[in-house]
Amino acid sequence: MAILGTEPAFDVTFGAEHAELMKQDSTAVLRLPMPWMAGPMTESLRIAPTSCRWDGDFLLAQSDDHLVGATLVDARGRLEDAVEGAYSRLLELASGWHLYRIWQYVPQINEVRGGLERYRQFNIGRWAAFERRFGRDLRSFMPAASAVGVGGHQVVVVFKAGRIRPEYFENPSQVPAYHYPAEYGPRPPGFARGVVAESGHSRSVLLSGTASIEGHRSVGEGDWELQFRTTMHNIEIMLGRMGCSAALSPSTWAREGIREAHFKCYLRHPEILPLVREWLQALYGTDDHFTY
């Protein structure tokens, strides 16, 4: 979820045949090989850019106050090493900025290779890069984030950073991801549950990927409605803590001073899309602000 303003600088389009990253005039464009089912097909990260340029394998869009970038990483070799290298470079590029949000798309994310799930391999590489950069205090620098599966053979990493130091938020009903026990892998996921960056004239609210988790356990296996209710409860908790409870209800945006809000809903089982849309519309009056 994001609440943003100003002109587009980085467009992310879903439903592509393969991952593609390119510069078009002053806008960076990322096309993702992720199935698109409903809602807006393109998401724009808006920062009123003063430049759009390549820096090695990263395409960057920059304004006075924000830096947005993306890279494609070949994931056919040892995933830990590839991810560590990409994140080390990302953290180098973002030196002098504060990381707000990272979107991560990992091919074959739940496959087991070499005795370890690929998402856990990904976490090892990401953690190693943060640890090398920030040392034992690495948890203080972890942004909001999400990691989901994607087609193709490339890991896609998109980040947003800013000049203003953000406030990091956790969900009191969930264990912080970076404190997950060892049963979830040699290194835990590295992210905050949410981030708010506020200046005198604008406020950005960025929510991490959220699921039906209580504590550190998934709940509602096989029960779609319980999973949905638990997930939305977690989202509502976080939005309340970050001071934007109205973000889910477009009819209240004008009154609450929200210019724009957008959510993405990732479904492992696409056949439940009609149910999810029905539930969201019943709760919030519309689901026009959701991409599926």
Each model region followed by its residue ranges:
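N-terminal presequence-like segments and the immediate start of the first folded domain
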Residues: M1-Y292
